[in-house]
Regions:
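Acidic, metal/ion-coordinating pockets
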Residues: 1-140
């Protein structure tokens, strides 16, 4: 889902300086409509998750929760943002994992560190570059 859901007329947050290219937003009434159209699962980790800051992220989560839509979500810390979400159906359980490969630098969720709380945000794909040298090439 590449938008935020909140009532722009009463929203207390603001658009962010770094954003995903457009300030997509919809009114909360879209939540029940999406559910009625058959949307049961939504991925939230994308370059628009924090276009409207933490307030937009949190209000969007609230609308989806109230509408009964499961979302592999951005969360209050990395554990929440990275957690799988599950939908139980008559035919079995469906799992949803969500991560982003394109995002603004401040969008990544983080783990708590000591007394510091976790950082709210999205589940970002974290890559580590490495070079593997075969043993036969590493001999001098």
């Amino acid at each position: 889902m590449e938008m935020n859901i909140f009532d722009i007329r009463s929203f207390k947050g603001s658009p962010q300086a770094e954003y995903g290219g457009a300030f997509h937003v919809s009114l909360p009434e879209i939540g029940p409509d999406l559910k009625a159209m058959g949307f049961n699962l939504m991925s939230r980790a994308n370059n628009h998750t924090l276009d409207w800051g933490l307030e937009g992220m949190r209000e969007t989560s609230q609308v989806l929760d109230q509408s009964g839509i499961i979302h592999a979500r951005a969360g209050e810390n990395l554990a929440q943002a990275g957690a799988a979400r599950f939908l139980e159906t008559a035919r079995g359980r469906v799992a949803l994992l969500s991560l982003a490969t394109s995002f603004t630098p401040m969008s990544r969720a983080g783990d708590p560190a000591g007394e510091a709380p976790g950082r709210p945000g999205l589940n970002a794909l974290r890559l580590a570059q490495g070079i593997v040298v075969p043993p036969e090439k590493s001999r001098a």
